[in-house]
């Protein structure tokens, strides 16, 4: 039985990669990487996101200047069709991932009830 669970996990991994939503994220990501300005904007977003997460984990809040930078970056992203498509595709994929997470972790949740 213990080997079977790994087989199921590997099967799930392949099934996720085969999802049209996953394929769409890959497709849009490749388009972003092929465009230098869009790729740079995406990298700025990732860096800003990591910075904000780090601040929040340490209990800090973004300054007014940082909030302005975040808003400006958000506006640039909203104006970029490729990035907009990427985040929409990510959102569609995240629905599956949330459902899968809920299903997979249900037995562990039962243990703490």
Swiss-Prot record:
**Name of this protein:** UPF0342 protein SpyM3_0545
Q: Which HAMAP family match?
A: UPF0342
UniProt source species:
Streptococcus pyogenes serotype M3 (strain ATCC BAA-595 / MGAS315)
**Pfam families, alphabetized:** Com_YlbF (PF06133)
Could you tell me which InterPro entries the record lists for this protein?
A: Com_YlbF, YheA/YmcA-like_dom_sf
Per the record, the similarity remark reads:
Belongs to the UPF0342 family.
